[in-house]
């Protein structure tokens, strides 16, 4: 032991375990990245515990169309979710006027018609929160 000086002993005691810890840390980070790639967690915005199935078809499905008495046809959009409250815009906030889930029914535009068991109106909102006169349902 006379050949190993005090500086060499300090290096062996402190630097050796430090190097081993660094190598272990790099290995663990690599394994974590590999696990994330395997389970595709990095491709999702929010991970939930709800199981879901996504199906893809090679053929284009038939789009539902409604035809009025005068011959006008409307393409119907079918939303896939039901909501317990509906966001009415930044100045009006959330609509919580009816109880139970609000299921979006077939609509002809991006503004939904709601099927919640009773007609959906904006009368429950205060005067300053009502939409402008140019806004119409389904437009």
UniProtKB/Swiss-Prot annotation:
User: What's an example GO cellular component term for this entry?
Assistant: host cell membrane
Q: Does the keyword Membrane apply?
A: yes
Keywords attached to this Swiss-Prot or TrEMBL record, sorted alphabetically, are: Host membrane, Membrane, Transmembrane, Transmembrane helix
The record's Pfam families line, in alphabetical order, gives: Corona_NS4
- Transmembrane region(s): 12-32
> According to the lineage, what is the superkingdom?
Viruses
Q: Where in the cell is it found?
A: Host membrane
Q: Does the keyword ATP-binding apply?
A: no
Residue span of the signal peptide, if any? none
- Please tell me where this protein is predominantly located: host cell
Record's bilayer topology term: Single-pass membrane protein
Task: Spell out the family assignment given in the record's similarity comment.
Answer: Belongs to the coronaviruses ns4/ns4.8 protein family.
This one is known as: Non-structural protein 4
